[in-house]
Amino acid sequence: MDFTFSKTGPSITAIFALFFIFYLRFRSKGSKNNAPPEAGGSWPFIGHLHLIGGGSRLPHITLGEMADKYGPIFTIRLGVHRTLVVSSWELAKELFTTWDVAVSSRPKFLAAKHMGYNFAMFAFSPYGAYWREIRKLIAVELFSIRSLELLKHVRVSETELSMKELYEYWNAKKDGSGQLLVEMKQWFGYLNLNVIIRMIAGKRYFGTTADGDKIEARQCQKVLRDFFHLAGLFVVADTIPFLGWLDVGGYEKRMKETGKEMDRIVEKWLEEHKQKANSGSKHDFMDVMLSAVEGTALQDYDPGTIIKSTCLSLIAGGGDTVTVMLVWTVSLLLNNRHVLKKAQQELDIHIGKERRVKESDIDKLIYLQAIVKETLRLYPAGFLGSPREFTEDCKLADYHIPKGTRLIINLWKTHRDPQVWFDPLEFRPERFLTTHKDFDVKGQNFELIPFGAGRRICPGISFSLHMLHLVLANLLHAFELSTPSHESVNMTVNAGLTNMKATPLDVLLSPRLSRTLY
């Protein structure tokens, strides 16, 4: 019998053979120098991708089960990339203190290349001079105490207006029992996008008094939704680079299209800001950036790219993160009605029913703050945090971690450590009034780091907490909340870049205050 080969046959065979040799050497290299244990179940070429990147099991749960078997520090292989998985707050503390500089960089994912202006987008930028300059600008001009106070009117006015619109919607659409069914994921999303886009670009896209183009508003919402979906996917090129040319699933093509659409929208904003720049007034962050970076070049990025990428990074992160947090907080309250009732009692005691909640009231709402902390413990915006990459060899728990290893901190596991948290799976805000009353979420208590820790900690923590407390307090004060037939809320998670609730959050609302207060 004769065998014939196509012209490409030998070359493809050679490529696979070379890759297999590389794979075996890579594994052998990883076994030296007292390497951490590697989880079982790895396959040639793909490593543990079949366990982590597909199927019905969520990655944080699978990795948590691996930690039960292999311990709080172990490695997996995502294609050709060795990845360290840490499931202990003590090890997280060592990483973000002793080895903080070494773990402050990001892997270069395809999404960051095509949708993040070739890694110019702040959230995805590698650690270095460019990242430090942009972070300093953001910290001073947008998220400092002074800046947050100057922008307070945006948070307050948007929250008040959203409550008014919600009341008017109830008044027009309420049923015979005086209730209105509202899908709160969308409502929270509109509110938070209005706040962050007003702060960044001076536009209000959603609601009855929106001042932006409705078509542009829908495009903006869609492109951000596509961004988060695509950025949260396992892409072949990120794990097995030599197969990237196949573009399995067409994800790279979609990323390029989404990146172009995002750029088209924000380029329009930038041109509008340039046209009004001669007035000398600075009303939003894009105005500030125009004067701060015009005529400069950081790491070969032109000023326009720096402005657009930074603004998009803040809009995507700020809007989605707070929305996710609010959705889970309300979901937990509806599944724990006694906690909801206690929160409303606290509001009635400190604010009463003759006025609305002010931002200055939040400091007095101790139980509400405990609810927020407990929600962030159980449902941080990302169960696996943001991926890091070691930029130098390190020694952790007596194990040698080579440069180039990727890092995952399993917050889902560390935040449920029974050695730290009594009844760790239960929603108990009271723990932050007693045993854990001195804990905060700003990266100092490594048992609770929903925003990350170290140099790469989320720069918008204070903004997120301001929004989370203000919106939640106003909603609980202004409306009674329940579910159809008093059913429990489905708590299924939709895994991705952030942990959004997989199903709608349908809530029955009715006013608690006099109509003159809306």
Q: PLM features: what roles do these ranges have?
A:
Residues 49-71, 264, 357-398, 403-405, ...:
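Conserved cytochrome P450 K-helix E-x-x-R motif and the immediately C-terminal K′/meander segment
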Residues 312, 397, 434-468, 493-494:
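Cytochrome P450 heme-thiolate "Cys pocket" and heme-binding signature region
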Residues 409-439:
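Conserved cytochrome P450 K-helix/beta-meander segment immediately N-terminal to the heme-binding cysteine loop
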Residues 31-53, 60-154, 158, 184, ...:
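Cytochrome P450 substrate-recognition site 1
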Residues 337-339, 461-500:
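Cytochrome P450 heme-binding "Cys pocket" and the immediately downstream C-terminal segment
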Residues 1-5, 480, 497-518:
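C-terminal helix/juxtamembrane-tail motif
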